[in-house]
Amino acid sequence: MQLPLKNLCFALLACLVLAGCKSSKTASEAGGTSPAAAESSRVVAANAAFIGKMNEQKVSAKAVTAKLKANLAGGGNSISANGTLKMKRGEAVQIAFSKFGIEVIRLEIDPDSVTIINRLEKYYVRTELRNNPLLGKLDIDFHLIESLFWGEFYMPQGLDARACAERVIASESGKAIKLFMNLGSTLSVETLANAEKALPESARLLNAAGQNAAIAFGYEERVPFAGGFFPSKMNLAAQNGKESFTINMELSKITEDAKWPSHTQLSGKYKRKKAESLLKLIP
């Protein structure tokens, strides 16, 4: 079980902790000119209306708990696992993977840190979310990460639909609309949304140079939930050099249960390891 466990750990690292980013794309390929130069007031108004329509599809729930079935593949190996996905808006994203009914790995993301807990070997790794040595100096925001898991269009805190529309570059892509938003000196996000339903179909994180920033989310299916539409099937894909890693998750028994701790309490039996030690898990 050791080799699959290493692949599981690295898939979590690559796909969820956003480690590594190597791509040859250029900024012009990813986004084009700045929104201020390219968008007219009429187009900005249309983009604001579309973003507003996407917001209307968001679920109203403040918390989500779901069972999951996952398949993780990378480094020439794959492993299937069951588990749970738990989220509280503004507080936590938790994913626990189990094998034979025993929890093996837990990933916990909160506004300040990322924690990976290895239940079998009794150790954990905790790093800061920002200024993380494993994030390739990408300025990752917790609210961006949770928007990906909730399957929602990311809106920086404090910005309404109009303000976001002034920052995006929108273009048609078949029956979808592509929205590119620069988030600062190190990061941008590209969302592909169904033009008719106004629901995100995928989202990619890019660095400021327009390069793939190690992660892409895809939303294959959604179900009515809490006044909106929540992803019931989603996939995460990551690229680290020549290796690609994927996590496909199918969710069931989705509820608004919030009766669980936002932070996992660990006993003294767990040893803390440095974040850099996870790089040794690369196949």
Question: What is the role of each PLM region?
Answer:
Residues 1-9:
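Bacterial N-terminal signal peptides that target proteins for export
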Residues 17-20:
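C-terminal motif of bacterial Sec signal peptides marking the signal peptidase cleavage site
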Residues 22-78, 275-283:
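N-terminal leader/targeting segments and the immediate start of mature chains
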Residues 23, 161-272, 276:
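Gly/Pro-enriched, hydrophobic low-complexity segments
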Residues 56-64, 75-79, 86-88, 107-109, ...:
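Edge/loop elements at the starts and ends of beta-strands within beta-rich repeat scaffolds
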Residues 74-78, 97-106, 186, 209-212, ...:
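Solvent-exposed loop/turn segments connecting transmembrane beta-strands
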Residues 92-143, 147:
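An acidic-aromatic
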Residues 129-130, 135-169, 279-280:
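C-terminal low-complexity, charged extensions that often adopt amphipathic alpha-helices
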